Amino acid sequence: MFTLPPLFTTWWGSVTRASDVSLGWVTTCAVLASGLLTYVAGIVRQQLGTRWMYVVATALMLVSLAVVLADPRSLPMAYVWALLSGASSAFTYSPSLTAVQEWFPRRVGLVTGLVNASFALPAAVAAPVVAGMLRNWGFTATVFALVVAVAVTQMVVIFLSTPHWLEKKRAEGLAFARREISAPSVTTAQAVRTAAFWQVWAIWFAGGGAAITMMTFAATYSAHLNDIGVRVSAVAAVTAFVSGNGLIRVVNAMVLDRIGPTVIGCVTSAALVLGYVLLGFVASGWALIVVAFLAGVALGTIFTISPLLLTPIFGIKNFGPIFG
């Protein structure tokens, strides 16, 4: 979700010579599908459970990669890939957050932070690796390798997705803690009529939008800098973004239960604002990399603080649909 859209977009730009606007729709399609289907994923997970959500997500991932293999140089196919890729992310992320809060209801900050980190840190590692594969192997071989990697890793995830050992070992304590954290039990319809819900929504709309724009902006602005004689690699900017996105989730996992989400959210939002201000005055490759890193930090923070802002108020029972 965080690595492939900007890297694939750069490759499609080189082979299709499409405009920045047309290429920008690749990331937009991925984000739209992920955002719109997170709500659906939350509802479906209540009926099917976490394991079947992972099965659906795996199927969507593999189909998305098959689509671009069918016609690698087609921009419409790229849009279809992005929509399917974003959908697979939605069917993985929201169910995972809900599941770990149910399993470890008294360590919500830690476990949701670790789940967030597990989504973002591999992206930081994968960015230079996938970029190297695209450069040395070509697009088709890279996608085939990704198909194999997705199939193998997702089979392991599906197998491990229901921790029966945890249920048996801690059944009594889990039951009490779940009743405690589920006490509010607010429905989605009730949640959207509260000020707290719209405050969190505003954080996502403004802060999340500003941060995730960097997924497209990193490639287009680096191209602009190269055009005016400032040498900078789009891969370096993307790597900075996904690194900030991953590292801050690890930090947040360690400190959220002690510091709380409000302070962390304010600090990272202020840092992102200052970063974008800097970028408006400094035409530098290093400035782009720093701001890309800060955008990743802000996005990772929004992801990790949201459960701590929502669950204590609305409960865990309908967390998936409310978060979506």
Language model features by range: what are they?
Residues 204, 212-213, 233-309:
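C-terminal transmembrane helical hairpin of 12-TM major facilitator-type secondary transporters
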Residues 91-104, 111, 301-314:
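Intracellular juxtamembrane helix-capping segments at the cytosolic ends
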Residues 37-50, 248-260:
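Helix-to-loop junctions at the C-terminal end of transmembrane segments
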Residues 1-20, 37-41, 126-127, 214-219:
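Extracytoplasmic
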Residues 118-166:
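Helix-loop-helix hairpin linking two adjacent transmembrane segments in secondary transporters
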Residues 4-12, 189-254:
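Extracytoplasmic gate region of multi-pass secondary transporters
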Residues 59-73, 271-283:
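C-terminal ends and interior cores of transmembrane alpha-helices
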Residues 3, 31-39, 124, 242-250, ...:
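Residue-level signature of mid-helix packing/kink "hotspots" within the transmembrane helices
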